[in-house]
Amino acid sequence: MVLTGAVKTFGRAGHGVRAVDGIDLSIGRGETVALLGRNGAGKSTTIRLLLGLDQPDSGTVRVLGRSAEHAVRDGLVGAMLQDGRPIQRVTVRELIAFVASTYPKPMPVSEALSLAGVTGYANRRIDKLSGGQTQRVRFAVALAGNPELIVLDEPTAALDVEARRTFWDSMRAYARRGNTVLFSTHYLEEADENADRIVVIDRGRIVADGTGDTIRGSAGSSLVSFDLAGGPTGGLELLPGVVAVEVSGDRALLHTDDSDATVRELARLDAIRNLQVSRATLEDAFLSLTSPAAAPPVTDSERETV
C-alpha cells in the first residue's frame, strides 16, 4: 500500500480545507499499522483515499499493486468505517452469507463468524443486538470477502473496555495469518499495544512514523518541568538535550533526551524552581508532536510495500 504526495482538499477553491497535505506512506505486507491523530487530523480522509472512496487532488494511491478501486473490487480489501450500519431485519448469519456471496473468493461463513467472535449470536436478528455486538458484526462483514488487507476507522469507538479487549484478540488472530491491518484510533494505548508501527498525522501531514519506542523517543526520553517564576522563556529550546518545549502559564515543560545535562544547565542558570523529572510517555510524545510547534517528521527505515 503506497500513497505518494497525496493531497485532498474539501471546499471551494481558495477557501478549502486541505485534509490531506502531501502524505507519503508505505505499508508492508503483514504489518499492523495504526494511524494516530487528533479529531480532524486527516485520518479518515487518508483511509477514504486508500479505499478509493475519494480521489486525491494530486499524488497517487496504489493498493496491492493496483488502484484502490480495483483492489476493493477484486475482494482484496475489507473495510470497517464509522458511518453506515448493517441491514437490520436479517440474522447475523444471513447477512454474512449474503456479503460473502458477492466476492469471488470469500471466507467461509462459519470462519468469518468465528474469527469476528459472533458465532454465539449468529442466528439473532441484527436489530436485536447491542451496540458492541453490532460493531463485531461489522467486523465480520469486513472479513467476509477473505481480504488480504483490512482497513478500520476508529473500530472500537463504541465499545467498552472488555469488548475492546475481545475485539483486538480477534484482530490479532486475523493478522497472524499474514494479513495486513491498518486502523485509525485516538486511543494511544490501543495503538501502542496492537500496532507494529504507529503513524502520527497532524493537520494532514505525517509528523512521526515508527514503533511506539521510536515515537516516544522523538519527543525526548524524559520530561523536565519547572516554574518560570516570571523568568524568560526564550532560549529554552537551546538547553542541552532539549528537543521540544511547552509553556503553559508560568510553568515550562522540556522534552529532553539527556535530563541530567538539562537539569545541570538549569541549575547553573539558577532556574530550578519546583523542578520535576519524569520519563516521557507515548501521550507526552503525541501531545508534543501535534502541538503548534510540532517536531520534524521521524521515520524508520524503508519497508517492502503492499
Task: List PLM regions with ranges.
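Solvent-exposed beta-strand sheet faces enriched in polar/charged residues
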Residues: T4, L64, D227, S248, ...
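ABC transporter nucleotide-binding domain
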Residues: W168-T256
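Non-catalytic surface loops within mature trypsin-like serine protease
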Residues: R12, R29, G120, L228-G230, ...
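C-terminal coupling/interaction segments
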Residues: D257-V306
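Hydrophobic side chains in well-ordered alpha-helices
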Residues: R73, T211, G235-L236, T262-L266
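ABC transporter nucleotide-binding domains
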Residues: M1, K8-F183, L188-D196, V200-D202, ...
